[in-house]
Amino acid sequence: MSGIPSKTDVVVIGAGVAGLAAARRLSIAGREVCVIDASDEVGGRIRTDQVDGLLLDRGFQLYNPSYSEGISVLDLKALDVKSFTPGVVVSIDGRNYKMADPKREPTWAIDSLLAPVGKISSKLKFARYAVGLAISKSKSASYDQRTDAFLRASFGTDLTDVLLRPFLAGVFLEPELATSKRFFDIALKSFISGTPGVPSAGMQAIPRQLAAQLPSGSIHLDVTAQAVARTMVRTDLGDIRCRSVVIATNARSAALLIPSLKVPPSNAVTTWYHLADCPGSELTEGKSTLVIDGKKFRGPLDDPSRPLVNTVVMTNSAPSYASNGRTLISSSATGVHSSTQAELGVRSHLAALYKVPTGNWTHVATYPIPDALPMMAPPHDIEQSVRLSDGVYIAGDYREVSSTNGALASGRRAAEALLTDDL
């Protein structure tokens, strides 16, 4: 894309939600901002493809309307977030058991209590911990550790391996639960505070709404940043002189621009989309509820018969994701898998999870995403410095926590630091 300016106040590199949040704050403060991105659309990792009347998010993603940053910068009514059921269905030995917050899904209360996912005392202990988190004002615990170690020590092996680990593997996108307990606490608190879902127009509606708040002509796509200095950004289309720079790319791209920058590794995911040959009302009681395999971590991690960490009927809550009343299923596995054999294994696992034949389901798309989520290993600093050097700032969920809220917060903090320094 041509037409980049030769001069501006601030260059923001990256048109994901972190970069857009930074640009929004700077524009409100009266700064002239130029946002550049190497991609052909805004959104970064939050992208939605429209294919034959279907909305296909690139990887299974949800948005929680309780996110504090989103409340401040997004029009949630316009996003029309379609909430999923606040719970999970756990598949164990040929049966499906419903687990949910009894206050929000009271009809599932008995099932939640009696499901063979651990001792009742362990479930009650976990519930008390979750309630305590919900009312806590603290941002993070002073001591950090691996989530897996904390869960086993606190709630026992059965509850951890049969319920918590299968669920959290799909949240963290890593099966070992080597992720920071600080991040676990933040994620759990958000699940309690609000019910995640998807915008009716797809997840990319979020960055598109942020982009629409910027002055016309602020965003320049198909532009690759090649080098950064305080007063200049070199791109493949020419140099842009500026007073300050905000680097809001993903971690890998940021490290290419700033070789001294330490960035975390990324967790990978593969998401498959299928159209079922039955109405959504025949699957998970017509609800959009995550289905997980309670036996997935009772055997080898690479068991080909149990590839998935979760699956959900998208259209039970968000019928706009498939035209003409079709039933769209989203299913995910950690790691990168793109072979035909992998899809056949997924289809077989889906039959076991939903308890229906899946041989006639239509495979729509596969999205292998190697850099799906920054790894949050302990000890993790949830508010890392946004100042890189004089006039150069950095933003991204890997600098905060791996979530849309973390990206929004990081972008805002980078912009506010710039404004403070540029008085």
Regions picked out by a protein language model, each given a short descriptive name:
Residues 2-3, 319-423:
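Conserved flavin/dinucleotide-binding core of flavoenzymes
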Residues 5, 226-343, 352-353:
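Mid-domain catalytic core of redox enzymes
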Residues 5-35:
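N-terminal Rossmann-like FAD-binding beta1-loop-alpha1 element of flavoenzymes
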Residues 18, 41, 252:
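Conserved Rossmann-like nucleotide-cofactor binding loop
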Residues 186-236, 240-244:
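Helical element adjacent to the flavin cofactor pocket in flavoenzyme catalytic cores
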